């Protein structure tokens, strides 16, 4: 799938003092997420930017590991694709941990975040400090648990409150 690419991460477009929510519509149902920009402003800004650009629409969950997580955000579906830029982790001073139903950035090592994210099925404390947690599922954990490899994201919508 050909998606737009950028040479740099997006400029800050969100207000970290506001609350942001995403609705991820998939072929298995809807997942509602609340983001925490006060702990991971660059990461939330990045997800909001990509969602508003339609980057995630039509992309599959290319990696699903039972009782662990679902991973999406790669337009190539190989686990190697992204928006053509990388940005740093936001784990220092971030009190959010890898509990059940959190959304976190997938990466290929420190400071290699792009567009790929994962949502946990269960607590994954071994990932704390290695991946930026930036939100929590508020509705649809049953959908997360039902998603299988190859299921697709239909649309991601962002709301600000």
PLM-predicted stretches and their roles:
Residues 1-161:
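Cyclophilin-like peptidyl-prolyl cis-trans isomerases
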């Amino acid at each position: 799938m050909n998606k737009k690419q950028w040479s740099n991460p997006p400029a800050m477009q969100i207000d970290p003092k506001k609350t942001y929510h995403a609705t991820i519509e998939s072929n298995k149902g809807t997942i509602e997420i609340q983001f925490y920009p006060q702990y991971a402003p660059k990461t939330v800004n990045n997800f909001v930017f990509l969602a508003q650009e339609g980057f995630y629409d039509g992309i599959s969950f290319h990696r699903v590991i039972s009782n662990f997580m679902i991973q999406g955000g790669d337009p190539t579906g190989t686990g190697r694709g992204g928006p053509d830029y990388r940005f740093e982790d936001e784990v220092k001073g971030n009190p959010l941990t890898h509990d059940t139903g959190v959304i976190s950035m997938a990466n290929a090592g420190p400071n290699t975040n792009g567009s790929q994210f994962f949502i946990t099925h269960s607590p994954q404390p071994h990932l704390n400090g290695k991946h930026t947690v930036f939100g929590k599922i508020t509705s649809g954990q049953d959908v997360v648990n039902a998603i299988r490899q190859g299921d697709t994201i239909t649309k991601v919508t962002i709301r600000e409150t």
